[in-house]
């Protein structure tokens, strides 16, 4: 056991994605609201620290809970617990400690609403998704997507102290995006989930129908993302949302024609950066905020 194993159970790429989501939303919340004074650099640092602790702790608890099924899946069989590189009780203690620390840290150094949404993210990922829905319901990832939304809502409330309609809608975008993203991955590794007895959508309804669900979800995601203009976003956001969402739509349409693991992986690689791009667009739009020149 060492730092490498602790880093691995923390899932640093997911930590980075959620911290980017929270920080860009914090910036947008500050820029688009009339509240004064806004957050300073220390507030951003505190949000990054609390978000990283929460995400890493949740990931560690996910590793702990899934220790019985990870050996059955090629993708996860070499994780630290099933490979014997770290003790399961160490991972449990680490996950509980830093998850709890994240909520306390946010409460005292940011504000109560931010601490609440960080706690919501931890609870929805660890309890609702990992411990309950993942092994029992084919819609598991749909409901579990609320964990990603919570990161955005935490960022907004860290800036404003409250969650208004625009802040809620921006965060809910993560929830809408999650099925399109994760079902592509599930199509790629369907055999793993089947071997582990996890009822992911491709296991339950097959590859062809899952590809149609992905396309249907993306057909909801694209207009939803564009509709945010009507609630306060501007031209910079709109242009980037059209381009990135349009590319996803093309690949997900092609996936319905070629519902194979290999093409699902290509679609996944297009879908994966969407969230980072769209939240960068939120931040850029907040910085420049050019209103769209046509009345809606």
Curated annotation (Swiss-Prot):
Cited Pfam families = UbiA (PF01040)
Q: Which GO terms describe its biological process?
A: heme O biosynthetic process
UniProt entry tagged with the keyword Membrane: yes
What family does this belong to?
Belongs to the UbiA prenyltransferase family. Protoheme IX farnesyltransferase subfamily.
**Record pathway:** Porphyrin-containing compound metabolism; heme O biosynthesis; heme O from protoheme: step 1/1
For this entry, the protein name equals Protoheme IX farnesyltransferase 1
Main location per UniProt? Answer: membrane
Molecular function per GO: protoheme IX farnesyltransferase activity
Which compartments does it reside in? Answer: Cell membrane
Miscellaneous comment in the UniProt entry for this protein: Carbon 2 of the heme B porphyrin ring is defined according to the Fischer nomenclature.
Which species is this UniProt entry from?
Answer: Cenarchaeum symbiosum (strain A)
PROSITE patterns reported in the protein's UniProt record = UBIA (PS00943)
Reaction(s) catalysed by this chain's protein:
heme b + (2E,6E)-farnesyl diphosphate + H2O = Fe(II)-heme o + diphosphate
Write out the function statement from the record: Converts heme B (protoheme IX) to heme O by substitution of the vinyl group on carbon 2 of heme B porphyrin ring with a hydroxyethyl farnesyl side group.
Which NCBIfam families does the UniProt entry name for this protein?
Answer: cyoE_ctaB, PRK04375.1-2
UniProt keyword terms in alphabetical order: Cell membrane, Heme biosynthesis, Membrane, Transferase, Transmembrane, Transmembrane helix
Q: HAMAP family, from UniProt? A: CyoE_CtaB
* GO cellular component terms attached to this protein's record: plasma membrane
Membrane topology qualifier:
Multi-pass membrane protein
